[in-house]
Amino acid sequence: MRKHIRLLSVITLSFICSGVFAQGNFATKDHGFVHGISKDYEWPTDPEVLKKLDQWQDLKFGIMFHWGIYSVPGISESWALCSEDRFTARRKKILPGASYGDFKKWYWGLAKSFNPTKFEPAQWAEIMKDAGFKYLIFTTKHHDGFCMFDSKFTDYSIAKGPYKNGKYSNVAYHVFDAFRQQGFMIGAYFSKPDWHCESYWDPALSTPTRNPNYDIKKYPETWAKYQQYTANQIDELMSDYGKIDILWLDGGWVRKPKQDIKLDEIVDNARKKQPGLIAVDRTIPGRNENYQTPELTIPKTQLDHPWESNITLTNTWGWNPKPKYKSVNWIINTLAEITAKGGCFALNVGPSGEGIIEEEVLVRLKQVGKWLQKNGTAIYATRITPNYNYGKVWFTANKDGKTLYAIYALPEGENLPEYIEWEGNEPNGKVTLLQNGKQFKYTRMDGKIRIMLPKGLKNEALAFSFKTKG
């Protein structure tokens, strides 16, 4: 199963602070435009959507893939195509000395060399299942407009290039199918803006911003073409790619009233094909943002509605040849914090242009999976509890609230202490260490619950369960 996994000869590990004890912000200069979180949330009224949301909230841990033509040279994602000033330095670093026009020609041309001959979707799905992931978010199309599915409405796709005769040329179909077979909930990432589409960026005009490069009010017929193009592609994904649970829409500047793509109609039509579909129109509160998506950050406090932090494992969304990896501790601690605050954690991985998931990714995910096999009861299918944090300890609860879980998030570079303590959440009887089922008595010291730790425990995050006195 590992024959197509590359072993890196030199790895630089970046043990980035997890933000476990305060709000974490993991954005770096290598990331593109970073979305915030919506200020408001509107609960859905459709019973099937509410049911699906509840099921999704049980899953807690999702794998997100950014994979496209940007993976060939290893340039994170497609934001360098945008001529806004914030991306100028990035373009110069990628293609020194090139004009913006030359850069665009070079970037569009990457489609001619994207040939992921080592892509094995079943292998990906098996790896991610073993790592403890429960749902998938896969980039069917980023802002560059390159489709990772065989769209009938454009030739700018993986199925029309060098990989057209590949075993899995309709990539998204095979990714969804492989992960679905492993029991994953399936999410289709789709970019609302499409910079390759002539009815969004007219190739005869300059492209000074991320927005349409023509006046929509003056050329409504051109914008109508784009509305239809978007509706057609989403309908393809909803009709021809099996059961889809989440429609994850990126590009929050495409919204009413200036860039109205008639999303209400699109989502209504999608739910005729996919009943209960969760719509995630990022950063746009209302009927089509069924859960919120703080990007590269964790909210400061608990939220009482559905949300997901999407954070990269490295310093970029897509694959890059010089990655800075976050640690196993960071992944586990971040998952504990997000879960205690009521969210789900979508961890992003970028496969290479060949379709390879790097060995250093696998090493980390394998260890995370082992931890979750022993301690996952404290994560999966849990809900929030009011007293959810004390120092390095995060608390979750089972659905009836009668069992609490305490997760000690071991800080990077530290050893387990002699004891763990917290205030509140007093156990009713002994506490159980999930990794081995052993029970411990607790004591009260200075108004705190204290648990003495035995010697010989592996130096990693610990999870305990106990009944409450409430």
PLM region descriptions:
Residues Q23-G470:
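Mature catalytic domains of secreted/periplasmic carbohydrate-active enzymes
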Residues M1-N25:
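Bacterial Sec-dependent N-terminal signal peptides
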